[in-house]
């Protein structure tokens, strides 16, 4: 765990804040669809299950990668800035000093986390991997690229994208057990 996300995950807070500003109490088709996704997420209640993390991407469908990155960055700056654990920042710095290549895997939407995580930890944005959605004509679609970095998918992301055997890994939820 790189930073304290309490009482909510940043991904959820960002989506709910965005929905409050852009979709809540509106009657158009898109607003109803987006609110239905959030209702389904709340009803599911398993915020580390694959359907839940897939629905985060479904909610972001129609936004550009830049809009999603800005949404994540702004939420981080507003609610989570200063909550990166100094011990984790020191560990990452020490690993890099000794020649380790550091990667961050998250079950949150990749574009939502890349900018602020890379900025705060000083790692390349390409080393922050999350749930990937297909970008078509410059906007996120609701199609998801496998593997999903959750449950057994997190272990599959390593050979698929990193292509190296890790020397050390860490996790913060039951979705990281595999």
Regions found by a protein language model. Name each.
Residues 8-82, 86:
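A metal-dependent, Asp-based hydrolase signature
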Residues 63-103, 107-178:
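C-terminal cap/substrate-recognition subdomain and adjoining C-terminal extension
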Residues 1-8:
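Asp-based phosphoryl-transfer active-site loop
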């Amino acid at each position: 765990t790189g930073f304290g996300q309490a009482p909510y995950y940043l991904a959820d807070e960002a989506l709910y804040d965005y929905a409050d500003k852009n979709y809540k109490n509106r009657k158009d088709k898109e607003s109803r669809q987006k609110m239905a996704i959030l209702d389904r997420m709340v009803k599911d209640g398993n915020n580390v299950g694959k359907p839940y993390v897939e629905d985060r991407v479904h909610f972001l469908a129609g936004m550009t990668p830049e809009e999603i990155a800005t949404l994540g960055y702004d939420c981080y700056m507003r609610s989570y800035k200063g909550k990166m654990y100094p011990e984790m920042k020191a560990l990452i710095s020490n690993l890099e000093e000794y020649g380790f290549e550091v990667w961050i895997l998250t079950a949150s939407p990749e574009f939502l986390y890349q900018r602020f995580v890379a900025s705060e930890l000083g790692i390349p944005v390409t080393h922050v991997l999350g749930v990937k959605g297909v970008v078509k004509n410059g906007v996120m679609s609701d199609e998801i690229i496998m593997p999903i970095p959750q449950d057994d998918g997190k272990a599959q992301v390593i050979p698929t994208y990193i292509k190296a055997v890790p020397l050390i890994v860490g996790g913060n939820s039951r979705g990281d057990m595999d």
